[in-house]
Regions:
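Conserved PLP-enzyme active-site core in the AAT-like
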Residues: 1-175
């Protein structure tokens, strides 16, 4: 508390943290930003990545659909949902939503949102993450991973590592 630094995110401590995260990810080219909370992160990420007519796909139990009091909808983006399977999204759900929105006069899906771990305490294995990412790539969708509970998943043997999450998603955060 006795040290003067420049504004949050621009100080030497944040730079050291960014350098450590880049080293863990084994990628010097990643963008790292510090935000104040999960809802704000979800809202900022979704609203900045999507155009006005685009939507995000989530399971019905997804945090952005149930617990964030309309934050995403406040930005003008619709959340398209499917009933979860143990709290999780599967590629078939994504494909089904894509088939349901073929018309230019409908909201256009552009992002898939998942949480690692889920609202039900389940988690995505590396293989499940790869399958979802492949489905997103096939459908030209971004994959966004809510990492508010990521620490719980990182200790599991068959869950993706941070490096693997960086490979098989377009954006994720560490809560």
């Amino acid at each position: 508390n006795f040290i003067q630094t420049v504004g949050y995110g621009e100080d030497q401590y944040c730079q050291k943290a960014k350098d450590k995260i880049k080293a863990i990810l084994e990628n010097e080219n990643v963008d790292i930003h510090f935000l104040v909370g999960g809802t704000q992160t979800n809202m900022i990420m979704i609203s900045s990545a999507l155009k006005d007519y685009q939507a995000v796909i989530a399971v019905d139990s997804g945090h952005i659909n149930v617990h964030e009091t309309g934050a995403v909808e406040f930005t003008g983006h619709k959340i398209l949902t499917k009933p979860h399977q143990d709290g999780k999204m599967i590629p078939e759900m994504i494909d089904e939503i894509m088939r349901e929105h073929p018309d230019e006069h409908m909201v256009q899906p552009k992002m898939v949102y998942i949480s690692q771990t889920t609202e039900y305490g389940t988690y995505y294995t590396l293989e499940e993450l790869k399958d979802i990412y492949e489905c997103c790539q096939k459908n030209n969708l971004y994959l966004f991973i809510d990492g508010a509970r990521l620490g719980s998943a990182l200790v599991l043997k068959d869950a993706p590592t941070l490096q693997e999450m960086a490979l098989y998603s377009d954006v994720f955060y560490i809560g």
